[in-house]
Amino acid sequence: IKIAHLYYDLANLYGDNGNLKVLSDYLIQQHAEVKIDKLTVGDNFNLDQYDLIYLGSLTENNFAIVAEDFKKYAKELSKVIEARKHLVFTGNSIELLGKKMIVKGNSVAGLGIFDYEVLPLDKRYMGEAIFHDVNDQIFIGFQNQANILNEITQPWFTKIEKGLAGTPSHTTEGIHYLNFYGTYLIAPLLARNYFFTEQLVKELLGNPADYHQEPHTIDALAYASFLQELRKNGKEE
């Protein structure tokens, strides 16, 4: 399994290396060979050769650098998405892919992969989050964002139990299109939500008949504990 960690040195704001470490460990438990290529500005990306492409959160300055460099891969990125390659984008990296993005306070053209535009919030939002996907699977994480997206036609999450919705409608968050998964959720996404990591592993391996379900007991207990604590804190508020 070949994984591309895009802009690994610029987009590792919230422990994104940890996300790929967890994913790699889960794959190895299934006796898969895993190769992670760490790519950044100056490297020549050949996105089609990868089974999964990952991009994490960026500081404002690093966002500007990546926004400029990533433009040349827009067509290739669109092709790999349509080819049903797996992609996971977390934090503000999802802002790169719309029609408009905000770079250092200015609205500029995005990569145009999706139709949404980025809108600034009145003030930065920070807080824990509990989101439900279309199958009512509950995801937990943290949000630290200065913007939202104006419209999402194919949301990943359709119920916001706790946290900030990703659109002005206040009902949806994230993007799920084919095998593209994008969300503002961080902290880190795959480490906190073990079941999603298991899902990715199954899909990357082609849902093999010999897939053996690992208990992931510690990860499951940590998830349950986090969720219980988040809900408890929500009631206290």
Map each language-model feature to its residues.
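A glycine-centered loop/beta-turn motif at secondary-structure junctions
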Residues: 167-205
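Active-site-proximal beta-strand elements of phosphoester/diester hydrolases
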Residues: 4, 140-145, 181-185
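Glycine-rich beta-alpha junction loops
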Residues: 7, 146-148, 187-189
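Cysteine-nucleophile active-site neighborhood
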Residues: 58-135
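Structural motif
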Residues: 52-56, 88, 182-184
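Pocket-forming structural segment of enzyme catalytic cores
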Residues: 103-174
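N-terminal beta1-alpha1 cap of cysteine-dependent amidohydrolase-like domains
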Residues: 1-79, 191-192, 198-237
